[in-house]
Amino acid sequence: LGPNGAGKSTAMRMVTGLTPPTSGEALVLGRRYADLPNPGRHVGVMLDASAQHPGRTGREVLTLAARTIGVGPTAVEHGLATVGLTDQEAGRRVRNYSLGMRQRLGLAAALIGDPEVLVLDEPANGLDPQGIHWMRGLLRGFADRGGTVLLSSHLLSEVQVVADELVIIGHGCIVAQGSVEQLLQQQGTRVRSTDDAALVAALTTAGIEVTASPAGLLAATSSEAVGRIALDARIVLTDLASGSAGGLEELFLTLTAAQSREGMAA
């Protein structure tokens, strides 16, 4: 997860060997992607659903992908069935596909080698609510069978439902990592007052880290401690709640406020 321009797609391109990192290395299954024997049999990749030849049919796209990595024609039919593309749709030119259909085709291409890992950049783009529900079930089933899915998304509610672990990035840096439950538990206390400047000063003097967010101040301590400090400083609180009260969306906005365009504009 991360705001536009945070580096989500760049990170995925580094994982799949398309963009060299300035330092360090990215490993998949313990190796660089380029060092994997026949990578498509181990890692299924969809970074841009529109990156298909518009003049080919959906079936031709999958047939070419299957031949490239050495799998038989039955994988093509299985892939089409898996992503819900009918024979009629498979016979249409990609230029006539909707964005949602291109997403399904791209996912079929990623799955065609029966990989252990999927790397998917915004796989739910263009899907309607039913399609998003279907995508969630497909990826959850893949993971439950022992596979690993690395995906980026801006659909926070869907991520909260399906993800086992989150990596939140901003400006190319990891700002938080862990399960949804772990991240929400670490978020301290959300507070508003009649004099936020004075409250920040009082909390800072007490050695408590305070961050401004769209939902108010976020203090890295318990609500009881914030209330006590505010009382001692004679500051009236108008809102006091666990930092996790706003859920994943508020957590995301808080952690990435400094990197987002909206945060910089504010």
Where are these regions (language model features)?
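ABC transporter nucleotide-binding domains
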Residues: 1-151, 156-157, 161-164, 168-170
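Short, flexible turn/loop "capping" segments at secondary-structure junctions
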Residues: 17, 40, 182-185, 211-212, ...
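ATP/adenylate-binding site constellation spanning eukaryotic-like Ser/Thr protein kinases
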Residues: 30, 40, 58, 171, ...
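Short alpha-helical
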Residues: 34, 53, 71, 157, ...
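Residue-level "edge-of-site" marker
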Residues: 79, 93, 215-216, 243
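ABC transporter nucleotide-binding domain
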Residues: 135-221
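C-terminal coupling/interaction segments
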Residues: 222-266
